[in-house]
A protein has these predicted regions:
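A general structural signal for well-ordered alpha-helical segments in protein cores
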Residues: 11, 36, 67-68, 134, ...
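Alpha-helix termini
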Residues: 21-25, 115-122, 171, 243
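Short, conserved glycine- and acidic-residue-centered signature motifs
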Residues: 32, 101, 228
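SAM-dependent Rossmann-like transferase core, predominantly class I methyltransferases
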Residues: 54-147, 157-162
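S-adenosylmethionine
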Residues: 111-114, 147-149, 153-297
Length: 297
């Protein structure tokens, strides 16, 4: 046993290390304390809530070594904690993740928790999660709408291996179809009540200046040309052919929102206002896309 290293002292050690390591907290954890709690809880198989009674526990020598190994790798390599643990939370659900997919963090999760109300007034019978990555958005939709048919798709075969693992882990195989597809290319003539997408939308300049943690993620899931709109342009032009009458398109574009409005000044984007401060998600209906579809010419 370690003579004096308690859970509390390990947490303090990790927090201090992270504070002096110039870490970026943009992958589901909010500060140095959160990172320390997350990694220690994983290594010691403890609940994330960390009851106060646990703080004076004295881990074994081997456990202390494992916690410190995770702390060192997070601080020195700038590896997102989700990749160190192969775990990430989204919409209150636990997902397997690795470097083949982005770490789940989309504010679309907040919309799913609200069942897309009031923007989608009728529960959708069919949902497409385009550019699914880990599958977290589509799987979360399956929980929110248990009677809906869900399709998830991605261009990356590697990402779909992870998504398929998550579908199996959440026992959603009977509700979710998985397609390897370059956007709508392999989806046939299926139409959907709701298309949700968190596509690549980082522009070239932003990507070059991003914190080191983002370079651990697959560039295919982040970069989308000089203005960040290469993929979104295709989605806007093609989505109308894959939406049912009355259907809606919900897309995250993050910091590329201003470039999008400048590129399409006549499209009536509805931007979701989040109380948490998140931004960059628009909603368009099929009818709005049809009415303004001349932008695709």
């Amino acid at each position: 046993m370690s003579d004096s290293t308690t859970v509390a002292s390990l947490l303090a050690e990790g927090e201090e290390l992270f504070k002096i390591s110039s870490l970026h907290y943009g992958h589901g954890l909010y500060d140095a304390w959160d990172e320390a709690v997350y990694l220690l809880s994983h290594a010691l198989n403890l609940n994330l809530s960390l009851d106060r009674s646990m703080l004076l526990n004295v881990p074994s020598k081997e456990e202390v070594a494992e916690v410190r190994r995770l702390f060192r790798e997070r601080s020195s390599e700038k590896t997102p904690s989700a990749y160190l643990t192969s775990r990430a939370w989204f919409c209150g659900l636990l997902f397997y993740v690795d470097r083949r997919v982005l770490v789940p963090r989309s504010p679309i999760g907040n919309l799913i928790k609200q069942k897309f109300q009031p923007w989608v007034p009728v529960p959708p019978n069919s949902i497409l999660d385009l550019c699914t990555g880990s599958g977290c958005i589509g799987i979360s939709c399956a929980y929110a709408f248990p009677d809906s048919k869900i399709t998830i798709s991605d261009i990356s075969e590697d990402a779909l291996i992870v998504a398929n693992k998550n579908v199996r882990n959440h026992k959603c195989s009977g509700q979710i179809q998985i397609f390897e597809s370059d956007l709508f290319g392999e989806l046939g003539d299926e139409r959907y009540d709701l298309i949700v997408s968190n596509p690549p939308y980082v522009d070239a300049e932003d990507y070059r200046s991003m914190p080191a943690e983002y370079f651990a993620e697959p560039a295919l899931g982040l970069i989308a040309g000089d203005d960040g709109l290469d993929i979104v342009r295709k989605i806007l032009c093609e989505a109308v052919d894959y939406l049912h009458e009355g259907g809606s398109l919900i897309v995250e574009v993050g910091n590329s929102a201003a470039a999008l409005e400048q590129a399409y000044p006549d499209l009536p984007f509805l931007w979701v206002d989040f109380s948490e401060g998140d931004a960059g998600i628009f909603i368009l209906t099929r009818e709005q896309l049809i009415e303004n579809h001349n932008f695709c010419k």
